[in-house]
Amino acid sequence: MDEFHRYGKEDSSWQQCFLYPLFFQEDLYAISHDHYLDGSSSSEPMEHFSFNDQLSFLTVKRLIGRIREQNHSIGLFVNCDPNPLVDRNKSSYFESVLEGLTLVLEVPFSTRSKYSVQGIKEWKSFRSIHSIFPFLEEKFPHSNYILDTRIPYSIHPEFLVRTFRRWIQDAPSLHPLRSVLYEYRNSPENLQRSIIVAPRVNTRFFLFLWNHYVYECESILVPLLKRSFQSRSSSHGSFPERTLFDRKIKHIIRISHRNSLKSIWSLKDPKIHYVRYGERFIIAIKGTHLLVKKCRYYLPIFRQCYFHLWSEPYRVCSHQLSKNCSSFPGYSLRVRMKPLLVRTKMLGELFITDLITDEFYPIVPIVSIIGLLAREKFCDISGRPISKLAWTSLTDDDILDRFDRIWRNFFHYYSGSFGRDGLYRIKYILSLSCAKTLACKHKSTIRVVRKELGPELFKKSFSKEREFDSPAFSSKAVARSQRERIWHSDIPQINPLANSWQKIQDLKIKNLFDQ
């Protein structure tokens, strides 16, 4: 592998034309087998293999020979495992070949990330969840429409092979990829004619396919949006005179219809911003309703032309920020008008002017949070707390720590929202559910639990939101945080909650489209 990388640095074309011999290197499958064992031991307990069940490189080479046959009607990994009772998804041979295939395909793409695709060099990109909320806070007040959709993850295998073919010149190296993809597509558990490529499939192979697929989508979509709508994606502060300036220039461009007597007035400088989390992405547009309709019509055509995916235009939802709310991710996002008092002194006289500016206004979706807690059996659908029966076998400290961790996750995640008074209802539900769980465990009532354990136990468990603020900020900063937003970007706590909102939103969209 080191020799391959050394030749690849000298000549990048050599790296793309000679990938197929890597499939016959025993070191590659030794590394992939170790990766499979490490991943299995870290996530789920794996059955102990005997000495006869260890990986055989001779068997692996026989598997590669069957891959070269290119017969999709015959299963590639049937009766090739020494233990026929082991399922294909848990087979060490199948996973080792899959890991080796991923390692080989990652070689030509390891250096590609250093170079930007033509057309994205000037596009300001931030690839971290830390940048989502500051991005929304900066760009949303200067936008008036939102397009909400998601990246389709049901892909035909041949399309994925063609996307790799544009980057890899060694055609034989793509035969194993095609065989593995068709193997997944023809599996009994997959009833569709396509395969599912999504970040929630937590394997190295499918994560690599997802990252490559998203890279292809964004590398084509973003430059086209930039050229079509002439967006600059430039950052600018919330200057008060910006609103008045837009009002003055909006009559510069006049578009008249042939069959209509009305005229359409549009802005000369429309702007468009793109942000994605997981499978969902939103496009913030500053422009007219005609521009939004064009973009809604353009996205389905883009999917059909470039990715051969059929999607109806109604799957792209549009919202006007001044009237409707948009959910992303787990927040109810909208823009509200904020009065601003400006004092101007000219020639010894003081003038007071009232200006109206737009302000990013994220709201805590209390109803959705109660629905999430009801699904996890902390309360019923009306928000009435119930005991968590699944936790009654734990110790008292473990029960309190789990409830405390849930509350802190909610508090940290919604630290940047306005109107956090609704979170106290969530705190009440969690605290009372904790008390009922302890009472159910000790076969007593809430009053007896409070009397025996004391109120300090509940106070200690649900008072750490102040402990979070006090070490990092002064008393003045804590008081200022009540009226200003402070984003606590803690990825281990943000990701699970955001993924939960992602699943709920996907379920709502699916139910809406199935009606």
Curated annotation (Swiss-Prot):
GO terms for molecular function: RNA binding. One of its GO terms (cellular component) is chloroplast. Its main location: plastid. Pfam families: Intron_maturas2 (PF01348), MatK_N (PF01824). Keywords: Chloroplast, mRNA processing, Plastid, RNA-binding, tRNA processing. It is found in: Plastid, Chloroplast. The keyword Ribonucleoprotein does not apply. GO terms for biological process: mRNA processing; RNA splicing; tRNA processing. InterPro entries: Domain_X, Maturase_MatK, Maturase_MatK_N. HAMAP family: MatK. Usually encoded in the trnK tRNA gene intron. Probably assists in splicing its own and other chloroplast group II introns. Belongs to the intron maturase 2 family. MatK subfamily. This is Maturase K. It comes from Cedrus deodara (Deodar cedar).
